[in-house]
Every structure is written in C-alpha cells, then in structure tokens.
Amino acid sequence: MPKYKEVYQKEVIPALMKEMSYSSVMQVPRIEKITLNMGVGEALGDKKQIEAAAADLEAITGQKVVVTKARKSVAGFKIRQGFPIGCKVTLRGDRMWEFFERLVDVAIPRVRDFRGLNQKSFDGRGNYSMGVKEQIIFPEIDYDKIDKVRGMDITITTSANTDDEGRALLNAFSFPFRK
C-alpha cells in the first residue's frame, strides 16, 4: 500500500473529521485523481516533439499517455482540426498515491528558487491546479537524454466541496503552500 494512502487512512481522516466536525467518514474529502497535461505547441512543425513529450510523461507517471488533438481549426495559430497539440495522463488509485508522494517529497523540493505554492490556485470546488516549468524536477527524467525543457499542468481533483476543505486536505499531507 502506498505510504500516503496509509497516512490518509490512519492520520488525515481522523484529523479532518475532528477539524471540520464531519458526522460521517464519507464526508471527509479525498483525492480522486491527478491529471497531468503537457501542451506541445511546437508539434505543429515537428511531429517528433509530441512523441518526446509523451515519452517524458510516460516515464514520470508509468502509464500510457493520451495524445490530445485540436478541437477546431484556428488560422491565427496555424492549427487544423485533429492536429495533435499535446498529451495528458489521468492517474487514479495506487498510481495516483505513488505519484502524489513523489510530487510532494521529491519533485517540488527540486524546483529552483522554490518559495512555496500559491494558495489561490484552487478552482472554487476544492480542486488544486499548478504549473511546472520544467520536467527535469522529476527523478525519472534523465537530464542528458531530454531534447527540450518542457512544462506541464498538474491538477489534483478532490471530493471537497469548498476551497477551504481542499486546502485542509492538502495541508494534512504537508503540501508546501506559500505562507
């Protein structure tokens, strides 16, 4: 069983039940999924860019990547409908917990000039989104083998109803928010 899943069941649930005064264990917010998205605008001129980005995401998550395609044509960006323009992965279950553990304990501390994550990046429904400027903060990525430094979006979807509940959940895992 992943470490953070055990921490959630043994420490976080009782702490949040007391803090938020829930009447049932099922009311306690939980992390439902983590979505990683990498937009690859350069893929228009070079198809290998998408493959390299997908390989990076696969190495980070250990799961097959879905290539996202343009929904409609935009002449200003020289995009045609159906063009591959990015890739994404949705993690659930044990893979999600293992990734969350690596994100909090290993990857985020490796960010250069890190001062904490913005607390205002909640969406109003308890979900947290953050951006990463370079994929090399993850230990699975070999710095010598990458062709280009790419960023990605990471969204942590929770079952929380409000931002305060979502913030309390992530704080219980000692998520590195800016003070």
Curated annotation (Swiss-Prot):
PROSITE patterns, alphabetized: RIBOSOMAL_L5 (PS00358)
Listed GO biological process terms: translation
Keyword DNA repair in record: no
Gene Ontology MF annotations: rRNA binding; structural constituent of ribosome; tRNA binding
GO cellular component: ribonucleoprotein complex; ribosome
Keywords: Ribonucleoprotein, Ribosomal protein, RNA-binding, rRNA-binding, tRNA-binding
UniProt function note: This is one of the proteins that bind and probably mediate the attachment of the 5S RNA into the large ribosomal subunit, where it forms part of the central protuberance. In the 70S ribosome it contacts protein S13 of the 30S subunit (bridge B1b), connecting the 2 subunits; this bridge is implicated in subunit movement. Contacts the P site tRNA; the 5S rRNA and some of its associated proteins might help stabilize positioning of ribosome-bound tRNAs.
Subunit and partners: Part of the 50S ribosomal subunit; part of the 5S rRNA/L5/L18/L25 subcomplex. Contacts the 5S rRNA and the P site tRNA. Forms a bridge to the 30S subunit in the 70S ribosome.
Protein name, per record: Large ribosomal subunit protein uL5
